[in-house]
Amino acid sequence: EIYKGQYFSKYKKSRAKKVMVFDLDETLGSFVDLEILWSLIERYTKSFHINFDELLDIFPEFLRYGILSILEYIANKKKNGECYKLFVYTNNQCGKKWTERIINYLNNKITSDFRLFDQIVNAFKINNVKIELNRTTHKKTYDDFINCTILPKTTTIFFVDDVSYKDMKKERIYYIKPMPYKHPLSTNEIINRFIYSKYGIILLPRDCTRYAFKAEYIELCMKNGTYHLYTNTTKTMLENDILISQKLMYHIKEYFLLTNKQNKTCKRKSVSFSFTRKRNN
């Protein structure tokens, strides 16, 4: 689903600030099973520290296919001054620290020269406790976003969320709603990959502790409704994930082209959307 505000109906020379806004869950990636695993690990770790970034590196499938290439493109736009800021606008219910861990991972993964994501707009409430003071509702709205970020209302916004919010469909918003991203890993594949990683070997040195840890993780996934018996991937699903990321990159490039203050003609430039997936070894 694509929504372009009236502002983007034609090419124009614009000095308005351009910002990018991403939802977290099922947009940047699929992180529910990772949160369950991390919570369990924290209960087991006593005498040593597990690096969260290194843990997530074990599971590159938790990130949406192609998202690192997309974020690298945005980082270059920030570096050359075309993109003013990059935000996360989330309703994640696991707390600020959890969201910060994922965003810090992405910051560290993309660039060490500057902070890629400028601000996280967190959930309105978690367990009925108000978290983001300048939000007024759990729904995502343009007014709440502006109040939280203190951006001028002349700002143009490229917004990506796998959920449709009618109050984010405004004149200066270019809104992309991709299909929700679901990682393809089975529950057994997740837990076995961790158990036999360098951290798993240290944390769970004996067969009995490995068995107990695995059983507890599976039970938590079942309670949470995220237990997957089989690996959920096919050639068609992979092709669909690739296509979604290609289309997302295309629309991001078009967004900058439509609002480029250097563009002095209305001649349409070709927009390439090829990319290669960044793999973690």
Predicted regions and their residues:
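Alpha-helical substrate-recognition element adjacent to the catalytic core
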Residues: E1-N128
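C-terminal cap/substrate-recognition subdomain and adjoining C-terminal extension
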Residues: G95-R279
